Amino acid sequence: MTDSITDLQSDQRPDRSYDFASAERRWQLAWTERACFTVPDVPDPGARTYYVLEMFPYPSGQIHMGHVRNYTLGDVVARYKRAQGYQVLHPMGWDAFGLPAENAARERGVHPGQWTWNNIAAMRGELQRMGLSITWEREFATCDPSYYGHQQALFLDFLKKNLVERRESWVNWDPVDETVLANEQVIDGKGWRSGAPVERKKLSQWFLRITDYAEELLAGLDQLDRWPERVRVMQSRWIGRSEGARLRFPLVEPLGDQREIEVYTTRPDTLYGMSFVAIAADHPVAAALAAHHPALAAFVAECRSLGTSEAAIEAAEKRGFDTGLRVKHPFCDETFPVWIANFVLMDYGTGAVFGCPAHDQRDLDFARKYDLSVTPVVLPSDQDAASFTIGRKAYDGDGILFNSGPFDGLTPDAARREAITRLEAMGWGQGVTNWRLRDWGVSRQRYWGCPIPIIHCDQCGPVPVPADQLPVTLPEDVTFDRPGNPLDHHPSWKHVTCPSCGAAAVRETDTFDTFVDSSWYFARFASPHAHVPVLKEAAQNWLPVDQYIGGIEHAILHLLYARFFTRAMADTGHVPVREPFAGLFTQGMVTHESYRAADGRWLSPVEVTRHGETVVETATGEPVQVGRGEKMSKSKRNTVAPGEIFNRYGADAARWFILSDNPPERDMEWTDAGAVGAYRFVQRLYRLAEAVARIAKEETNRDDASSDAAMTLRRMTHRTVAAVTEALEGFNFNVAVARVYEFANALTEAEKKAAEPGMTAARVEAITLLSRIIAPMMPHLAEEMATLIEQGPKLVAEQVWPSADPALLVVQSVTIAIQVMGKLRATLDISPDADQDSVIAQAEADPNVVRALEGKRVVKRIYVPNRIVNFVIAG
């Protein structure tokens, strides 16, 4: 038998007693008509509120399986909390500005706005097919002036609070496209679109002063106990607090007004091991020298082609240029060379470092390359000072200082403190706290973004746009037929009158980094139609977000910017909280096998066919190479279209498989077999409910007595309710799925004893409660099952979460193993409360155990409560 990897023909399916397509449409309409998911901006006093939010999507045009997983997880939480009696805010919006829309305009001749809104319509339809319990009336897109106008107002409030600054900074400049490139858009030193060599260029940029909050952002991580530890660690490292020293090295020969080079270091204890000073290519000393040294100027230009990110600089080969300058050591009479190095960043510390090759690998590699001295000054505890040398690896461990004059014999920590004390006493430096975090440059030279609400006047300088003139909207009549920012080229949009003096002026043509749009959207959802950015009463009730869900790839920038924005909004009177997200869950990726033809072409799942263990290209019959499950990507064509999955198996089956495969924080592999299995399970549950409903209608005389079989089923029902509740509380959704599978097996077994007293009532109860506990995961099927057994006028979506009967959770008996010398001889059913002596006595009386112990001397009796008895015999 052969079948397409992603296709399941109708004749391969079991009988479809459950028409998922019509059921899903019917129940989605019912939820909408009854406003099941609508909540007010300001809930009634005393109402319990819960805010669950998944990171909103970029409207690329179609959802992918990663979206399906993300929004399924959030919907489970939202439906579960709603059933628990909470008023649940579960909104959806669109992160709608960004470069892809401009690329579409250039490549396809369609306006970015039209492209974006068409994509939103398509993706909204696909998301609605999932049956998400979204409050759709709160939907917005960040490209709508009704949203970004409030963003402009926030920016101006931040400006008044001195949280905004305009200054020059180095950027990656594409000279062909005439635009600034983000670090990730620089590929091997070239622009990702134009292929032109990238230049580092100084431009005036707007910055948000996130560094003002560095200390608070770092300290606040300790309070986020419902965030993954690895995310908190990543943010802590990004903020990067370090204790060190700023020290000044006098130049042996002054360079104009430059008489010294200031260095920041976290290791002043290693000063006696210094070998050189390295400065950034953008350092003032380098600039002064470049004006008169062509070779040095060429090296500086080469450094500027690396890009501005730490990652790009770290990955590049470490290279340097000897300036010929030398500096004096603060503690001795030695002098050391000054090099320009391509690994030193101007915007970290002071733009200069001293190199201690013996105890820093990067410095050691540099020193070996340029034949600079290497002097160890920290001696490992197991080494001898006379023989210790540095080979290919720098030593960065603990030890005792040597070769360090007055610091000899001190630990590195003690030497660090002593070095700072001496530097301060000599006037050559001081201890300081430094931060890796840099202020956030938010200027982008693009059209499709939120306009920065500033007007530039030759007389007044930068002037804020008056509040009554917001929003500053984008012009519609733009063209993309030339490089650069269309706003710069527009004939009229930027030409305005200065609001302060009335003179001719121009608008700011830069737009905001799209991370600004996503740094406060969660707050807008609390009152999306308010005349202010956030209605204070709504923020008081809904913020912070109780549960935020999204990918680990946003662990640093988006989450850190949102934490900063929340603090800035609090300090400007907009929100009453300082943290945006009380709880954070980072889900794993959805992966899929990849398929490659013999000629190297990547094939999509619909282009291959499986013959047992062999996979071939359907068109040619040739075998294909099957790759391991990896992230779905267009480049490898291993994507699966959610819409096709919904058509074939239904939304509930897709949701069920998404939840069942792995713990949600891990990656999951999408497989055809898994989707088929989920589809069949949906059909199986429906048939179980159908059978119970039929018997319940036929049976007129119900016996109030309950047989052992009925009580066994009831106990299983309530234990399942308790187990699923516990699993959902702990985000162990795959465990909840497993418990439902077990319960379905128990229901199937119960069919064999359908005639026993009380069994019909027990089965009706089982289906009733089952429909409630699967509702967060398979909401359409839950409604359909409840209808079959005529549950009542309320929808399952309106029902309260069931509580397990404590009396039915009590374990009546447990089965334990009886072993002799570790070998199983018998089993024994006992009360879970039975004492050890009685259990051992019962075990010793078992005939099989009696025979095994006959003529033997028992030297030890081991009892593990409710699990095992083991008899140890002599010899």
From Swiss-Prot:
Keyword flag Ligase: yes
Give the residue ranges of motif 'HIGH' region. 57-67
Matching Gene3D superfamilies = 2.20.28.290, 3.10.20.590, HUPs (3.40.50.620), Isoleucyl-tRNA Synthetase, Domain 1 (1.10.730.10), Valyl/Leucyl/Isoleucyl-tRNA synthetase, editing domain (3.90.740.10)
Q: Which PROSITE patterns match?
A: AA_TRNA_LIGASE_I
Q: What's in the keyword line of the UniProt record? A: Aminoacyl-tRNA synthetase, ATP-binding, Cytoplasm, Ligase, Nucleotide-binding, Protein biosynthesis
Q: Which residues bind ATP?
A: K634
Q: What is its EC number?
A: 6.1.1.4
NCBIfam families with a match to the protein in the record: leuS_bact (TIGR00396)
The record's HAMAP family line, in alphabetical order, gives: Leu_tRNA_synth_B
Q: A Pfam family this protein belongs to?
A: Anticodon_1
> Which reaction is this enzyme known to catalyze?
tRNA(Leu) + L-leucine + ATP = L-leucyl-tRNA(Leu) + AMP + diphosphate
Which compartment or compartments is the protein found in? Cytoplasm
State the GO CC annotations: cytosol
Gene Ontology molecular function, alphabetical: aminoacyl-tRNA deacylase activity; ATP binding; leucine-tRNA ligase activity
Q: What is its main location?
A: cytoplasm
According to UniProt, the name of this protein is: Leucine--tRNA ligase
